[in-house]
Structures are given as structure tokens and as C-alpha cells.
Amino acid sequence: MTLSRRKFVRDLGISGAAANFAMGLPSLGWAASGISKKRLIFLFSPNGVIPKHFWPDQAGELQSLKRILAPLEPLRQHVLTLQGIDNRIKGDGDGHMRGIGCLLTGIELFPGDVQGGSDTPAGWSMGISVDQHLKNRLQENPETQTRFGSLEFGVMVPDRADTWTRWSYAGPNQPMAPISDPYQMFDKLYGQTQNKAMLASVLDDLSDDFRKIESMVSPEDRVMLKQHLEMVRSIEKEIKSELQLSSGEKTTRHPVPQLEPNVEEQNDNMPLLCKMQMDLLLSSLVNDFTRIATFQITNSVGNAKMKWLDIDEGHHSISHEPDSNEEAYEQLIRINTW
């Protein structure tokens, strides 16, 4: 089948969002030549891990995973742990500020006027972060350019700009703000919508577009299309459920344990917010909107209360308990595993 991209979109009357996904289906002839796209996601969660229950006991092929990494067991053959790569950054700022502010930059913080819990005050990072460096490299090459060079996702990141809330840097003194609101991220990915009701409408149109494409692709691509359609429907369902809840209507959605039935940015909604952001992240990768992303859960010194794990005390507070406190030790393992 020989068909130009422009004619394909015009004749089918599908949206740009659906077309962008369709262009990557091999049976339509526009996919890259057999070479898998390389993608990279950096994930941040605060307050460290319990080493004994995270790192393997010996080097080499992983025969088993420790308790914290156990959820990755179905993917164990693809898991690689890199121990001993230490980012020993000195300079201004306390350990928490340097812990996040230098994590992806590998360089010190500028002197500044932000005072941490100890040590000298500090400012932003002195250099670019590795995610933005890779973004720039990919965007320079027409074959690896994407609509968004990178995407910065957040979950419950405080609405303030300081050294504790930023880890991605476009350059010296240029922190990148993560987007914590999944609806705002949807707007970024799929266009500037006026309200949440329009989001559901856009997703509904996408579903129709994918059905138009279905008969034109191979059985293998049809499987990919079906998976993508299911993901779109899942996000659409969550948005419609939130709209129903805000208007007082009943919903049949199974609630996330111990969460209020809404999708507001609040502590108890963290599991649902994580899922919605991860769905959008997956969507952006499948659509090849980006190949580089950061996913930031709260912030340095993050003190979320993991009530869905039956933990009422703040995460950061628990992390300062000694290992001899068996209850706190166990709580940290559960938090790390989650």
C-alpha cells in the first residue's frame, strides 16, 4: 500500500493525536526501519531505600530479587542493578538539597540564599542534567526528534520552586518544573482544552479514530492498536468518573483503597495520581511524543503519609528512625516496595 501521510490523515478524517500513533505502525509503512526506539525514564522517590532489602547479595545474573524489587519479578531477566556508582557532591547546601539538586547533574549547587536544615545556604544547580543533555542530543538528529524532547512528570510535588523540588535542569540556574496535575499534562500532550469535560470528549474521538484505522493495519498492529485503545479508554473513564463525582453523580469506579472518591492533588490520592501520570507517560512513549522523561514522586524531604499502606506517620520522619526501631524499619521496606 502506497499512501502519503497527508492523504492518509485527510481521507480518514482522523485527529492529529491518532495519526501520530498510526504513523508508527509497521504495516502502514511509516515506522522506523526495524530498530527499536531507545527510551529513558528517570524515577525519583525520596528518603532512600533499605539497602539490605534492595541490593542483590552478589554480582552477576540475578537469580532472585530482594523484597523491595520483588514486584519486578516478571521482568527479572531484563533488570540490571548498578551498585557502587556514588554521586559524592560537596559544596553548598545540605545533604537533602544536594541529594536531589545534584542527582542528575553531577555538579555542585550555586551559592544562594536558600537555607537547608544545616550547612551553608545554596541556590540552583551549576549545570545541565543528564536527561536534558540527552534530550538535546536526540533533538539535534531529525531521525530521533520528537514532538516533546522530554517530559517532566510529577506526583504531589509541592507548588513552590526551590532546590528541594527540582532535579531536572536545562542548564546552569535553569530548573525544569515538573507537571503534577494529570489534567495539565493531558493538555500538554493532546492540546489546550478549556475544561475537563472536553478532555473526555477528545478521548472519545480518539477511540473512534482508532476504530477507523483498525481495518487498514496488520493483525500484529491491530494488537498494538487495541492495547493503545484500552489505555485511552482507561484514562477517559477516570476523567469521566472525576466529573461525575464533582457533580454529585454516582460512579461505579472501584476506588483506590483509603482514597476519597476524587482526583484532587492531595496526600490520600497519591496512588491514583501515580497511575494516571504513568498512563499518560506510557501514552507519550507509545505515541513517540518523547523518548526522555523524568517521573518525580513528591520531593526531597518528602513527608507523604502512606495511609494506603496503613502508615500514618510521614515518610521523611520515619526515615530518620534508627534501624533498631523495627516498626519503622518494616514501614520503610513497605514504602520502598510500593
Q: Which residues fall in each region the model found?
A:
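Ligand-binding pockets and gating/stacking loops
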Residues: 1-338
